[in-house]
Amino acid sequence: MTEEPIKEILGAPKAHMAATMEKSPKSEVVITTVPLVSEIQLMAATGGTELSCYRCIIPFAVVVFIAGIVVTAVAYSFNSHGSIISIFGLVVLSSGLFLLASSALCWKVRQRSKKAKRRESQTALVANQRSLFA
């Protein structure tokens, strides 16, 4: 089965090909085509989870944070203030904190948008109910 019917069934536009031209040592022109990915194809490939990255970041952030704590604790247990390992531990620790904070921020923004959508749908429902009983 070819890919074209599947793309048409999914409603995805046909992928355009980006062409790059390169010259080979023998003065021949070689054209390389690279398919471009559309947002619909990305959604189909990820199962619609591209908007929930905060859920994927949390486990990774926790592991990075714990690794940062361990490396920093080992570095400072040897009283090596300012050494490469202590700086590396602090960088890993701060990146873990940053990932946790960004995940929490994304979660808050997502919750606010869900509340706003819920409020809009309730407003429309109440307005529709009033027009039915008026």
Swiss-Prot record:
Task: Tell me where in this chain the PTM Phosphoserine is found.
Answer: S121
Q: Where in the cell is it found?
A: Cell membrane; Membrane; Perikaryon; Cytoplasm, Perinuclear region
A GO BP term here is: in utero embryonic development
Induction per the UniProt record: Up-regulated by GDF2/BMP9 and BMP10 (at protein level).
Give expression by tissue. Answer: Expressed in neurons of the myenteric and submucosal plexuses in the gastric body, jejunum and proximal colon. Expressed in arterial endothelial cells and neurons of the central nervous system and peripheral nervous system. Expressed in umbilical artery endothelial cells (at protein level).
Q: Which residues cross the membrane?
A: 56-76, 84-104
Gene Ontology terms: cellular component: endoplasmic reticulum; perikaryon; perinuclear region of cytoplasm; plasma membrane
Q: Which UniProt keywords apply?
A: Cell membrane, Cytoplasm, Developmental protein, Differentiation, Endoplasmic reticulum, Membrane, Phosphoprotein, Transmembrane, Transmembrane helix
Membrane association type: Multi-pass membrane protein
Q: What does this protein do?
A: Plays a role during embryonic arterial endothelium differentiation and vascular morphogenesis through the ACVRL1 receptor-dependent signaling pathway upon stimulation by bone morphogenetic proteins, such as GDF2/BMP9 and BMP10. Involved in the regulation of nociception, acting as a modulator of the interaction between TRPA1 and TRPV1, two molecular sensors and mediators of pain signals in dorsal root ganglia (DRG) neurons.
The annotated subunit structure for this chain is: Interacts (via C-terminus) with TRPA1 and TRPV1. Interacts with TASOR.
Q: What name appears for this protein in its UniProt entry?
A: Transmembrane protein 100
Source organism (scientific name)? Homo sapiens (Human)
